[in-house]
From Swiss-Prot:
It comes from Francisella philomiragia subsp. philomiragia (strain ATCC 25017 / CCUG 19701 / FSC 153 / O#319-036). Keywords: Ribonucleoprotein, Ribosomal protein, RNA-binding, rRNA-binding. This is Small ribosomal subunit protein uS14. Part of the 30S ribosomal subunit. Contacts proteins S3 and S10. Belongs to the universal ribosomal protein uS14 family.
Length: 101
């Protein structure tokens, strides 16, 4: 079980990403636009650097919805491998069954 502070930190990061997503996209569009002047690109890069570090989408880490575990989390289910196996064996995940061949 993850500490509550770690889970709250991830939630805070998700809020920051949502808040600054539009601004980040606009600045990145200016930087990648071939018609932008060097000065415009330079200013956009400076503004992008001044945004909060945690507002970058790559800083957000998927966590298990049950335990808060940060590793081995399946996107489709939002569960870590341990809980996914536990729920699948109990029949709590619809359409999922143990493979046998």
């Amino acid at each position: 079980m993850a500490k509550k502070s770690m889970i709250q930190r991830e939630l805070k990061r998700e809020k920051l990403v949502a808040k600054y997503a539009q601004k980040r996209a606009e600045l990145k569009a200016i930087i990648l636009d071939i018609n932008s002047t060097e000065e415009q690109v330079w200013e956009a890069q400076i503004k992008l650097q001044k945004l909060p570090v945690n507002s970058s989408a790559s800083r957000v880490q998927r966590r298990c919805k049950v335990t808060g575990r940060p590793h081995a989390v399946y996107r489709k289910f939002g569960l870590c491998r341990n809980k996914l196996r536990e729920y699948a064996m109990a029949g709590d995940v619809p359409g999922l069954k143990k493979a046998s061949w």
